Amino acid sequence: MLNVGYDCGTQFILIYWSIIYVEKLGFNLSLVYTLFMCALILGSVLFNKISTSLNSKGITLLNTGSMIGAFVLSGTLKNKYLLLFLFLLIELLMGMMSGQISATSNEAIYGESNKSTMLSTVSFIAEILVSVSLFISNSIMEIFGDLKVMFFVSAVYFGVVLLIIPLIKEKQDVR
């Protein structure tokens, strides 16, 4: 579930920021894409470094809280350089989250004999849900007529997917 939610969120950011919002701000798409990839990779490396000293739950809470804050700020600010900085911060956090989700997925399927089938199924479901979520995102944007509303939608989305769902699952696992 976490993997699917992350994939849907990543596609939203990739499509709406990298293509539509970049055009409105006047940045070069190649430059932004390169910075985006560097931030994503740096986030993954950073996760590998800090995961040895901090617990997974603490990293998730800090990361998700920071991401929600960056989304909300992105929806309220107008300075294009601050928006670019926030975008790169979001991508750095997404890179950290990617490493964390990979680690969590590996823990979840450790010892399973049909790992490839499980991963393929999750990937297939993720692609379908990504398509559905992009359709919903498009509809929301058409209703409100402003891209900035999508940053608030993203903040709520990531709050639900990365905080509420894992906390509910954790409570169920305790029982």
Q: Where are these predicted regions, by residue range?
A:
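Multi-pass alpha-helical transporter architecture, strongest
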Residues: 102, 150-175
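Conserved glycine-rich helix-kink/hinge and helix-boundary motifs of the Major Facilitator Superfamily
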Residues: 1, 30, 61, 116-120
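Intracellular helix-loop hinge segments at the cytoplasmic ends of transmembrane helices
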Residues: 19, 98-109
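Helix-loop boundary and gating motifs at the non-cytosolic
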Residues: 1-32
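C-terminal transmembrane helical hairpin of 12-TM major facilitator-type secondary transporters
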Residues: 57-101
